[in-house]
């Protein structure tokens, strides 16, 4: 039933934006004892938002931040708990990469939580191996060349 997922690109003016904030908070912040709504969300306005919707409900999202004319950073990928381990992350990442490639961006980078490094490696991302802390947990920078 994953095939019923509709993927699209929105921005912060979309009616889905509130659901995007809620999902990011529930999946990425609340388990760490943090609150997304206390963060500065201004830069969301300059980013593309990739969403996966099924039956009018947001199931997954990620943020695309343009760094320069060839580089995009993927941020805050979140998949609803009920949809995890069903290929949704793969679908939304593939959709995001296709969008980047079609718009002539050739490098995608991201800061992966250590627990997610294996997932991104399967998608062809490589790490420099240097660990750092973000939101209080270990991350590594990963990159993929789309060209």
Label each residue range with its predicted role.
Residues 79, 85-98:
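Conserved acetyl-CoA-binding loop-helix of GNAT-fold acetyltransferases
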Residues 4-20:
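A short beta-loop-alpha structural element at the N-terminal edge
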Residues 25-59:
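Active-site rim helix/loop that mediates acceptor-substrate recognition in acyltransferases
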Residues 80, 113:
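Residue-level recognition of the GNAT/N-acetyltransferase active site
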Residues 66-77, 84, 134-138:
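A conserved beta-turn-beta hairpin within the catalytic core of GNAT-like acetyltransferases
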Residues 51, 57-66, 73-78:
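Conserved beta-strand in the GNAT
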Residues 109-111, 121, 126-141:
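Conserved catalytic-core motifs of GNAT/GCN5-like acyltransferases
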Residues 93, 100-112:
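Conserved GNAT acetyl-CoA-binding A-motif
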């Amino acid at each position: 039933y994953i095939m019923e997922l509709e993927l699209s690109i929105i921005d912060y003016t979309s009616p889905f934006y509130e659901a995007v904030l809620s999902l990011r908070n529930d999946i990425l912040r609340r388990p760490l004892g943090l609150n997304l709504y206390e963060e500065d969300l201004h830069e969301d306005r300059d980013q593309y938002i990739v969403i996966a919707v099924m039956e009018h409900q947001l199931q997954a999202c990620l943020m695309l931040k343009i760094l320069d004319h060839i580089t995009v950073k993927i941020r805050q990928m979140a998949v609803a708990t009920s949809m995890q381990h069903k290929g949704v992350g793969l679908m939304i990442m593939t959709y995001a990469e296709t969008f980047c490639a079609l718009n002539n961006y050739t490098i995608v980078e991201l800061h992966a939580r250590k627990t997610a490094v294996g997932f991104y490696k399967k998608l062809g991302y490589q790490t420099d191996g240097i660990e750092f802390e973000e939101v209080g947990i270990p991350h590594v920078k990963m990159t993929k060349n789309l060209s």
